[in-house]
Each structure stands twice: as structure tokens, then as C-alpha cells.
UniProtKB/Swiss-Prot annotation:
GO terms for biological process: circadian rhythm; osmosensory signaling via phosphorelay pathway. Keywords: ATP-binding, Biological rhythms, Kinase, Nucleotide-binding, Phosphoprotein, Transferase, Two-component regulatory system. It comes from the Bacteria. It comes from Prochlorococcus marinus (strain MIT 9312). The lineage of its organism: Bacteria, Bacillati, Cyanobacteriota, Cyanophyceae, Synechococcales. The modification Phosphohistidine is found at residue 150. PROSITE patterns: HIS_KIN. This is Adaptive-response sensory kinase SasA. Member of the two-component regulatory system SasA/RpaA involved in genome-wide circadian gene expression. One of several clock output pathways. Participates in the Kai clock protein complex, the main circadian regulator in cyanobacteria, via its interaction with KaiC. KaiC enhances the autophosphorylation activity of SasA, which then transfers its phosphate group to RpaA to activate it. In addition to its output function, recruits fold-shifted KaiB (KaiB(fs)) to KaiC to cooperatively form the KaiB(6):KaiC(6) complex (independent of SasA kinase activity). One of its GO terms (molecular function) is protein kinase activator activity.
């Protein structure tokens, strides 16, 4: 004779919720011999039987409804199985407790509380996702701020050097005015970037077009002329006459050359040399290499130097170490779809390589660029 009491249950859950560990454990237990009840379990998909939500006044799913024996009881949340385990022994003793005048009817407050807990869990998940989105946006804005702040240094330094040169009689007033005007225009463009930080991802500020890398590198070399001539450093270039144009943002690509050449100058010895080469690597890419004969970079630091917020200690006497400039270079190269890396040996020097896409008639709307 089967003395097990009958228990009719309805599990209301979406298909994806049925794979959760709590629900899987619940179903497995109800189907096992460990459960001292004759279980009648109905599993319902709310989209197929929406009337169940209204009938049982469900405010959250998954939910387990005890239909009979009366009274009805509802469990909701992410711990339905543990809630049920607490009540099964009570239901099993229900006949005895009724004779003793003890009421095991579930508290409405408990039922509401468990459903509210599940709603709060959902709200917490949404808040976490929103927080993650905001954090990424703030990080993106911080990168732009650091990049623009770093870029401001170049025109300000150039303007300062021009003023000093004019005082020494090396350039006339007309030349000084020309330099100051050009540098102020650069600062104005950078200030526009700053104004857009709050509403725009910095990658979206790029304006890729058909450009000549040879001209860009020449401009950077001339802009830093004061620095390498002062230390009698020789700069050699190897740029093929048939090098194809590339698809890149002129201002940003110029910044990459300025940063890398400036680093090469900084880490070169007096009377040293720097070599700049460009090759048409494949049909889609041009590879640029800037080599110095400086102190070199330790192997364990060669990847870290491109990270945000990383500034390595000085690598040789009189140098201040690699700073934010290489992080800026990485972001710029990656947003163009290219990559940047370094090959270095202590006591021999460093070669920085980066790739830029060849211009093939594409435009920005074709989404040729990819995020780095």
C-alpha cells in the first residue's frame, strides 16, 4: 500500500531558466525516490500559458506553485529548491499538526518576500550591466584625455623652441609668427577633441583618408629637428618611391611618428643614429620600422610599455623612461586595424614596428577600421 501523500505542483519557468542549477536540482529531486510524496509536476512556459501569471498573481519567474493540497503556496527566486526542502517535512506532518491545532499555512509576507527578492536580483543584474557599460565609457574617455594631454605637449614645446630660436637670432619674426600660428591651430583642434569627450568615443574622432606616409614622417622629422641636431644624431630613411598611399587619419598618424621618433632620439646616445624604413608588406598593409641604438628594453617589459597607465622606470642614465606616448601609439594603430610591437635587445637597441592599411578606395562609412 502506498502511504505517500499526493502533491500537485506547477513550475512556471522560461526555457533558459530550466537549465539553472537550482531548477535542475529541484526537478531531479522531485523525480527521485528521496521525495516522500506522490508528485504531480507540471512544467509551464509563461509565453505559452500567460494566463498562469495572472491566475496565480506571479510577479517573478521561475516560480513553483503548490496547487494541492490546499492552501496554495508559491516559491520564487533563485533558491526555490532550498525553500521547498524546508516545507516538505512540514507538509508531511500536516495531518498531525492540524489535530494539534497548529496552522502551517504559509505566511503571505514570506511568499511576497521571496518574489521581491527575485525582482531585486533582476534589478541588481541590470544595475551591474549598466555599471559595466559606464565604466567602459569612462575608461574610453580617460584614454582620450590622456592622449590629448600628451599631444598638447608637442605644439607647446615647438612654440617654446621657436621663441628661443628667435631670441638667439636663428629665425626672424615672420618665421616665428608662422610657427606660432601653426601650433595654435593644432591646439585648437585638440581642444575640439576635449569638448567631445563627454559625448563621443575617442575612436569616433578619427578621420581616415588617403595619405602619404613619406610626407608624414618627413614632417615629424623636421618638427623634431632641434632635438636630434642638438645631439648630432643622424636620421636615415629608407622609403620606396613606389610605396602606396595608406588609409589613415593624418593627425593621428603624425602623432605616432612624433612619439616613436622622439623616443628613439631620447634613448639614443649623442652622435648615434636612427633608421626609419617602410615596406609594402602585403597587398593590404604597409609596415613601418623605427630603430635606435639605445640601451634596449628588457624582454619582460616589452609588452607592458604599450599598456595604459604604465610608465617604466628610466632605462639608461639621463632618460625618464617610456611613458604614455606608447600607449597612445597602440590605441591609434589599433583603431586603424593595424598592430604595433617592439623587437629589442639590451645594449643593442630597439626597433618599433607598426602596420597601416593600404588605401584601396575605401572610406570611413565602409567600417574598414576596427577597434583596438
Amino acid at each position: 500500500m502506498n502511504d505517500k501523500k499526493e502533491l500537485k505542483l506547477i513550475l512556471v519557468a522560461a526555457r533558459n531558466q530550466l537549465s539553472s542549477s537550482d531548477i535542475k536540482s529541484l526537478i531531479a529531486y522531485l523525480e527521485s525516490d528521496d521525495c516522500n510524496f506522490e508528485i504531480s509536476l507540471q512544467i509551464s512556459e509563461p509565453t505559452e500559458q500567460p494566463e498562469l501569471l495572472e491566475l496565480h498573481r506571479l510577479v517573478a519567474i521561475p516560480a513553483l506553485i503548490k496547487v494541492s493540497p490546499a492552501p496554495k503556496q508559491i516559491f520564487a527566486g533563485s533558491n526555490i529548491f532550498s525553500q521547498l526542502q524546508k516545507w516538505l517535512p512540514r507538509w508531511n506532518q500536516e495531518g498531525l499538526t492540524k489535530n494539534l491545532g497548529i496552522n502551517l499555512q504559509p505566511s503571505k509576507i514570506d511568499s511576497i518576500r521571496t518574489q521581491k527578492e527575485y525582482l531585486l536580483e533582476d534589478e541588481l543584474l541590470v544595475l551591474r550591466q549598466e555599471n559595466e557599460t559606464l565604466t567602459k565609457r569612462i575608461e574610453s574617455q580617460e584614454r582620450l584625455l590622456r592622449m590629448v594631454a600628451h599631444e598638447l605637449r608637442t605644439p607647446l614645446t615647438a612654440a617654446t623652441l621657436a621663441v628661443q630660436s628667435q631670441k638667439l637670432g636663428q629665425i626672424d619674426i615672420a618665421k616665428l609668427q608662422e610657427v606660432i600660428k601653426r601650433r595654435l591651430e593644432e591646439i585648437e583642434l585638440l581642444s575640439q577633441d576635449l569638448l567631445e569627450v563627454g559625448t563621443t568615443k575617442w575612436e569616433a574622432l578619427f578621420n581616415p583618408q588617403k595619405i602619404d606616409l613619406g610626407n608624414i614622417s618627413a614632417e615629424a622629422i623636421l618638427e623634431l629637428e632641434k632635438f636630434w641636431r642638438l645631439r648630432d644624431i643622424e636620421i636615415d630613411t629608407d622609403i620606396p618611391s613606389d610605396l602606396p598611399s595608406v588609409f589613415a587619419d593624418q593627425r593621428r598618424m603624425r602623432q605616432v611618428f612624433l612619439n616613436l621618433i622622439e623616443n628613439a632620439i631620447k634613448f639614443s646616445k649623442d652622435y648615434g643614429s636612427i633608421k626609419i624604413t617602410m615596406i609594402h608588406k602585403t597587398n593590404q598593409w604597409v609596415e613601418i620600422t623605427i630603430c635606435d641604438k639605445g640601451a634596449g628594453i628588457p624582454l619582460n617589459e616589452q609588452k607592458r610599455i604599450f599598456l595604459d597607465r604604465v610608465r617604466l622606470p628610466q632605462t639608461s642614465e639621463g632618460t625618464s623612461g617610456f611613458g604614455i606616448g606608447l600607449s597612445v601609439c597602440r590605441r591609434i594603430v589599433q583603431v586603424h586595424g593595424g598592430r604595433i610591437w617592439v623587437v629589442s635587445e639590451i645594449g643593442v637597441g630597439s626597433c618599433f614596428h607598426f602596420t597601416v592599411p593600404v588605401w584601396q578606395g575605401q572610406n570611413k562609412e565602409q567600417h574598414y577600421l576596427t577597434k583596438g
